[in-house]
Amino acid sequence: MKKIQYFTIITDTREQKPYTFQNIKPEPPAVIRQGLKTGDYSVVGLESKITIERKSLSDLFGSAGKGRKRLESEFQRMNKFDYAAILIESSLSDIFVNPPGRSKMNPKAVFRTLISWSVKYNVCVWPCWSRDAAERVCYLILNNYYNNYYNLKG
């Protein structure tokens, strides 16, 4: 059995509300702040292999509306990674039932954009029911990718 290796998470320096990963058990991972060309989170040594972008519900609606070209460019850049994901700090039902109050975007249009671009650019979209859940999912994705990449555990 191979010894479990610990990894270091990179948080992009532009990330305004970074995850701390302090509630991860049994031990929080090491985290550093470093500029990433794409995404908000990656793993030291695997920056060109895996990327994760975090979006709050209001970020998502803003990006799908006025920031549409920038959002599609982000999907295009993410397509170059072995694994790329967008984590939404909200449930799928919230996209439809509780869209941001000031948004003029049709929730169906936002949802269809996510589906269309996730397929076109091979980017996973993970709606999570809360910010805490999204932080946990972010950790689990990075941890699983790291372990699979280095063949550390089955």
List each language-model region with its residue ranges.
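Non-catalytic C-terminal interaction segments of nucleic acid-processing enzymes
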Residues: 1-47, 59-154
